[in-house]
Amino acid sequence: MFFSNKTKEVKTIAKQDLFINDEIRVREVRLIGLEGEQLGIKPLSEAQALADNANVDLVLIQPQAKPPVAKIMDYGKFKFEYQKKQKEQRKKQSVVTVKEVRLSPTIDKGDFDTKLRNARKFLEKGNKVKVSIRFKGRMITHKEIGAKVLAEFAEATQDIAIIEQRAKMDGRQMFMQLAPATDKK
């Protein structure tokens, strides 16, 4: 069976257990008016009549409550506002990715500067940077050289980054993680 993304999105909004008008199957409800005022506990038929007179919908917003809570509202407008809020929340969400910069224990000055420049670009864009050094062969016996390179890298980026995770070994790799420094002044 084929479902499009739009179908799934509509189902998630409608699937909030919000029963509308004739879908409500309870005897009495605690009723909330159009302006948010409490109208008390009313029989379902009376609540539906009030909603019909106002040309709006009766929406069951809390079916688990005793008695269930229903609100007189324009459901189309409510759904539109809900979708609008969801869209705003997705816009505000920023996706932070972790970029990796690979170094070697015997890296040359020019290569080091190039990797540093790339890492600075990533940090300025707001991404985190994982700096890793892979030890090949017998280089693993000289871990202090790798630690020195990572310390130099951290020192060179200290103006725009903070060390989120200090240098540590993981198998034949030593790595540290940098995060962009946030100035909240």
Curated annotation (Swiss-Prot):
Coiled-coil positions: none
Predominant place of localization: cytoplasm
Pfam family of the protein (one): IF3_N
Gene Ontology terms: biological process: ribosome disassembly
GO molecular function: ribosome binding; translation initiation factor activity
Keyword set, alphabetical order: Cytoplasm, Initiation factor, Protein biosynthesis
InterPro entries in the record: T_IF-3_C_sf (IPR036788), T_IF-3_N_sf (IPR036787), Translation_initiation_fac3_CS (IPR019813), Translation_initiation_fac_3 (IPR001288), Translation_initiation_fac_3_C (IPR019815), Translation_initiation_fac_3_N (IPR019814)
GO cellular component: cytosol; membrane
Subcellular location: Cytoplasm
Protein biosynthesis in keyword set: yes
Description of how the protein assembles with itself and partners: Monomer.
Annotated family: Belongs to the IF-3 family.
Function comment: IF-3 binds to the 30S ribosomal subunit and shifts the equilibrium between 70S ribosomes and their 50S and 30S subunits in favor of the free subunits, thus enhancing the availability of 30S subunits on which protein synthesis initiation begins.
Protein name, entry field: Translation initiation factor IF-3
Organism: Streptococcus pneumoniae serotype 4 (strain ATCC BAA-334 / TIGR4)
